[in-house]
Amino acid sequence: AIKKGVQNELLDEKLLQFDLARLGAALKPERDLQFDYLGLQTLYDRYFLHVRKTRIELPQAFFMRVAMGLALNEIDREARAIEFYEVLSTFDFMSSTPTLFNSGTLRSQLSSCYLTTVPDDLDGIYESIKENALLSKFAGGLGNDWTRVRALGSHIKGTNGESQGVVPFLKVVNDTAVAVNQGGKRKGAVCTYLESWHLDIEEFLELRKNTGDDRRRTHDMNTANWIPDLFMRRVMEKGEWTLFSPSSVPDLHDLFGADFERAYVAYEEKAKRGEIKPSKTVPATDMWRKMLSMLFE
């Protein structure tokens, strides 16, 4: 399987430097019996290497290939590979899916998740979407922080126009995750994050609804809303909550705790005096109800 994988440019040719006879002797074919039908079918469908849809691995060879990739840079690589194989093949430990997919391959991307912050400029936004596509291609899960991107109605100096906010870009992110699945083995996985004071938060909370304009819906993408303690106190006090565009409050996203609360309250006072636009004040309890209701959509 190793030689065939290298010949078909699926595996790193450095794997041929291992003592393959020693590793082959360490295989325990009887451990295949630990799998039930569903487990074997999942390995066959998603994990085994194949050449034009013909699988070139069996379960124990698969585990050894993963172990070899992990031991590639070890001093006594055969001994370490056998150790890794032992814990994998006995199910004492199981690596993450990207490691199982990619260990020992030409692109040994072994990490499960990548977290990024999207900048507030067009080049940066589309560079982030491109990075999403490339990471998803090799089975990386994605978490994107979109809080820095200016909200709907914010001024764009370069064009003297107004921003369309984060939602149209999130539709592109959603469709990119669908188009660039994880090596053809499973759906792309992406979650976008927004803070509760962002002016687009109300529409953001509705992204996964089954009703409304489908051009402003992201049915295949997860969403996450960061909630500060101050917001929850406003909910309990039945107070108001002010929404801002991050372009008007550029430092707010970097603050937390008491520093965040001081800055947020100061920005609220400025908004009341008309010194910050656009902004919006909503009842905190209404926002809280919307957050809760979207958990069940």
Residue ranges and their predicted role:
Residues A1-E297:
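Extended catalytic cores of very large enzyme megasubunits
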